[in-house]
Amino acid sequence: MAKSPANNAAQRVRKKVRKNISDGIAHVHASFNNTIITITDRQGNALSWASSGGQGFKGSRKSTPFAAQVASEVAGRAAIEQGIKNLDVEIKGPGPGRESSVRALGALGIRITSISDVTPVPHNGCRPQKRRRI
């Protein structure tokens, strides 16, 4: 007799393994439309991530500093569960969620050891987008 599919699905679910990693890197990608926070270990393996859109903000509310703050809190709490205590923050992009995401991580009790801006700056590469006219 074949096993029921519900039973098989329940057996395949794996429990999250708690990694005891004390140091990590918070990658904050702040675009004009969204803010994505990924917290990794020193080797670059992702421990947790969150985005403004993933927290229920849609449309123009995704690109607010408050949405970035909420996303940082969600990613930070998940990283604390993994054992993170110290973070280096790497910020990429010109978006409005740059500063508020760093403040939110610090408010969670995570010690921020360094903040660096890794926004890619072209040496006159691709042509930029046309100016917006309203």
UniProtKB/Swiss-Prot annotation:
SUPFAM superfamilies cross-referenced by the UniProt entry: Translational machinery components
Name of one Pfam family that matches: Ribosomal_S11
One Gene Ontology molecular-function label: structural constituent of ribosome
Subunit details: Part of the 30S ribosomal subunit. Interacts with proteins S7 and S18. Binds to IF-3.
PROSITE patterns reported in the protein's UniProt record: RIBOSOMAL_S11 (PS00054)
Tagged with keyword rRNA-binding: yes
Source superkingdom: Bacteria
Functional note: Located on the platform of the 30S subunit, it bridges several disparate RNA helices of the 16S rRNA. Forms part of the Shine-Dalgarno cleft in the 70S ribosome.
Keyword terms of this UniProt record: Ribonucleoprotein, Ribosomal protein, RNA-binding, rRNA-binding
Gene Ontology cellular component list: ribonucleoprotein complex; ribosome
Official protein name in the record: Small ribosomal subunit protein uS11
Gene designation: rpsK
Recorded family membership: Belongs to the universal ribosomal protein uS11 family.
Biological-process GO terms, alphabetical: translation
Gene3D superfamilies the UniProt entry points to: Ribosomal protein S11
